[in-house]
Amino acid sequence: MNTGGRLIAGSHNRNEFVLINADESARIRSVEELSGQTCQICGDEIELSVDGESFVACNECAFPVCRPCYEYERREGNQSCPQCKTRYKRIKGSPRVEGDEEDDGIDDLDFEFDYSRSGLESETFSRRNSEFDLASAPPGSQIPLLTYGEEDVEISSDSHALIVSPSPGHIHRVHQPHFPDPAAHPRPMVPQKDLAVYGYGSVAWKDRMEEWKRKQNEKYQVVKHDGDSSLGDGDDADIPMMDEGRQPLSRKVPIKSSKINPYRMLIVLRLVILGLFFHYRILHPVNDAYALWLISVICEIWFAVSWVLDQFPKWYPIERETYLDRLSLRYEKEGKPSELAGVDVFVSTVDPMKEPPLITANTVLSILAVDYPVDRVACYVSDDGAAMLTFEALSETAEFARKWVPFCKKYTIEPRAPEWYFCHKMDYLKNKVHPAFVRERRAMKRDYEEFKVKINALVATAQKVPEEGWTMQDGTPWPGNNVRDHPGMIQVFLGNNGVRDVENNELPRLVYVSREKRPGFDHHKKAGAMNSLIRVSGVLSNAPYLLNVDCDHYINNSKALREAMCFMMDPQSGKKICYVQFPQRFDGIDKSDRYSNRNVVFFDINMKGLDGLQGPIYVGTGCVFRRQALYGFDAPKKKKTKRMTCNCWPKWCLFCCGLRKNRKSKTTDKKKKNREASKQIHALENIEEGTKGTNDAAKSPEAAQLKLEKKFGQSPVFVASAGMENGGLARNASPASLLREAIQVISCGYEDKTEWGKEIGWIYGSVTEDILTGFKMHSHGWRSVYCTPKIPAFKGSAPINLSDRLHQVLRWALGSVEIFLSRHCPIWYGYGGGLKWLERLSYINSVVYPWTSIPLLVYCSLPAICLLTGKFIVPEISNYASILFMALFGSIAVTGILEMQWGKVGIDDWWRNEQFWVIGGVSAHLFALFQGLLKVLAGVETNFTVTSKAADDGEFSELYIFKWTSLLIPPTTLLIINVIGVIVGISDAISNGYDSWGPLFGRLFFAFWVILHLYPFLKGLLGKQDRMPTIILVWSILLASILTLLWVRVNPFVAKGGPILEICGLDCL
């Protein structure tokens, strides 16, 4: 091999050799070798450099790239060579970009800003090596006009895309908008901008921009098939990306190392401190209060385990960014139908009296007006209460949508829920330039007020239900007069029936669904309603993606669906994503957020941590699903590339490693075959239990159809739609036949002997079906994504007061207890699947946390007991113990501060979350634990009422009202007991004196810790507006008094030995 006296270098990671020059004058390749080559990105010929030599972009591999592509890649791309991935260095005559070294080309600063002296005019303005002297050109001379790097002979001299100044000193150019008058004189808009930016597609004419992109796509296809084989196939991640349309639609943004590394180190340090703390606590018991010490140590160990389960899933938090412009470039091409995937939106409601129809109507209107192709959106409203009020309100909503939807899209209104748009105090004229906007906004506001009056009239009419029930306009009875016994109902209000808006544009589909209900059937509450919507939508529209929102969660960001599609439709990473979860944001909450309704710590810290693992858990609303994932299919397996071997190891070492690798691969293949065989056997057993000859049956089409029907149900239309990964319907299906099939799939007995609720759809078995559903999908190897756009995608209404908030938390905790006591418990379910171990820890924490209520209740009672008895849970504290306690409390505080820093959470939100953790733990979690045990073990059913979402006229009129509920008694009792203990402890110290104030300080600090966490109750006791109901106060004081007197009477922690006063009398003194 003739090396020409140069050094040869290579690597096992690159399939190439690099020739290193022996002296500075030598080049990697000569000018003769590179002359005449074409750019491997755009296909144009490579021009000469400033020095008159052939342009070489990469000094490592000399991959042929022209200067405009090189500068575009450095300015807009990843700034690296497409072949060897080496970062491009700045070449003489090219503009600087962020990341260039300070001394890089310092001798070229003049040429960087003055192109007239560098001889760069020809290659900047002409990609075909056409040379002309710009400085000497007369004002009236014909200058070749360029469109995105190519000459366009059809453009007249009066319609210049680039304006060149005749002065020899410098060159001006303009990013000119398209003027309708060709005689209009263009002028520079940004004279300081670098002229080179126009060499690679920065002219603002949209039609030419699209034409240029089309030509670039064609050139790219030629290069991809006929060019260098090292570029790989179309799915390879190493393919060079020429424009934004081929770049990823989203990217991960890890937390800065300056924030996350100290946080991780502190977690490890806190683990060490915890170990030393428990070592001290266990080896130093309190002899005169052994029971108190033992109980406290048990509680502390449980708290430590709970902290580990909560902490480690936050080890690798990340954030994400989306690129909506790239999504449009890739899937929305001008002159062609949109290629964005369809989305079926599910809205669920039950009781229109507690979930006002006006709130549901606003949610539906925000969905119909979403910024997405109308033929790709369908809204399905599930009315599980079969209320005629909901039906009529939805009919009025469909009529008003004909005016509201075109108004929103014409003026880009945000948010697109009219109630919140008109009530928000904001500058609605900002960025509005249309002269008719103010007039049309006033008219639209008047129309919406009339719409509200109609809805209010319907609500008032529905208050008085006729004895014989409601009837339709033609006199036929309303099918849903009996809520528990009625047929299935489907009504298509908008969509394919020809109803258009006032501007004659098509509207998204709007479908009313009320599934069949009969006595004796288990309808599985919300999970059953959602599964009915899956089947109905699969028959009528069959979009590949589903969005689930509650009736009070409207779309606050009209581009929310596009945000989700940036993840779902990403060709590189989208195939393995089962759902995109958005955070919950709320309206109608005061600034202090006294009851932690926003739940900021969970959504901005915990969920970001889970996103760095296998993805966030499903929280029940604001989630875009992949339909195939809900159907119980496994995630696509990623093919592992073979590892490269290195020649630097001895042969005997490679031989040993190869033997171990072969053994491991054989074992893995054997296990894989066994698993596949067991799956096939299990599938055949499910198809035909107790029969023989299953091998023959499995080969027949009838057996395959039987298997699908056993899984999805007895609907051939729906079974056929389930096999379409990209959605769509049969071409020969008529709307009438599809409607009949949709009625069938929402019948009561459709799910019998199928896998609905077990392996398909929303999973049954818990009132928190959201946790189970997400857990099932993660167990199948799918991953989820947490999307937090700058403008919140969805907003909803939070519980009005503390009582409703506690009932909401009670429902969540009861669902966790049900999952813990079921076969789907993450402690023992799903091993051998695709669930990662840190993700499993998060699911274990989500079902274990209600059990913390028992040690928390006991631990919050200990301060009062210590103050009443004069005992304490720790012995006399030494210097070592003092340092240990201070280190523990300090690590807890600093961990919280660092979490707030990288999670961007305020101190107020963090403290409210800590308060409500104690309040909910000693009230709702405790009740949920006992109700869950009764429900699972004894079969005692618990009925939950829907949380009221109606608001009064006052902004926060009911926010702090304490309504009667037994959930308020335990925390109030704890508060009173600790206040009594503080009073008794201080009084005893003043009366009798203390040898050491240290023990008293420790007990008082312990008691005040509990009182501060229960402060909202204390404010309810003392405040006027927030006063607690008298019955709760009476019961709490009575219970606290009984417990205090009983404790003083029993006094179990006082030694029983010693003199007895009745025997020795006064001589004992």
UniProtKB/Swiss-Prot annotation:
Residues recorded as binding Zn(2+) 2, renumbered to this chain, are 58, 61, 81, 84
The stretches annotated as zinc fingers (RING-type) lie at 39-85
Where are glycans found on this sequence? 943
Family membership: Belongs to the glycosyltransferase 2 family. Plant cellulose synthase subfamily.
Q: How does it sit in the membrane?
A: Multi-pass membrane protein
Pathway it works in: Glycan metabolism; plant cellulose biosynthesis
InterPro entries in the cross-refs: Cellulose_synth, CES_Znf_RING, Nucleotide-diphossugar_trans, Znf_RING, Znf_RING/FYVE/PHD
According to its UniProt record, the EC number is 2.4.1.12
Cofactor binding: number and manner: Binds 2 Zn(2+) ions per subunit.
Q: Organism's domain of life?
A: Eukaryota
Q: What else is known?
A: Partially redundant with CESA6.
Q: What is this protein called?
A: Cellulose synthase A catalytic subunit 5 [UDP-forming]
* Molecular-function annotations in GO: cellulose synthase (UDP-forming) activity; zinc ion binding
Pfam families found in the cross-reference section: Cellulose_synt, zf-UDP
This molecule's function is given as: Catalytic subunit of cellulose synthase terminal complexes ('rosettes'), required for beta-1,4-glucan microfibril crystallization, a major mechanism of the cell wall formation.
Tissues expressing this chain: Expressed in young plants, stems and flowers.
**Intracellular or extracellular location(s):** Cell membrane
- The protein's enzyme class: transferase
Extracellular compartment segments: 287-288, 875-879, 937-965, 1019-1027
**What residue ranges are annotated as transmembrane?**
266-286, 289-309, 854-874, 880-900, 916-936, 966-986, 998-1018, 1028-1048
Annotated positions binding Zn(2+) 1: 39, 42, 66, 69
The keyword Protease is assigned to this record: no
Q: Which organism is it from?
A: Arabidopsis thaliana (Mouse-ear cress)
| A Gene Ontology BP annotation from the UniProt entry | mucilage biosynthetic process
Q: Enumerate the residues binding UDP-alpha-D-glucose.
A: 348, 354-355, 384, 525
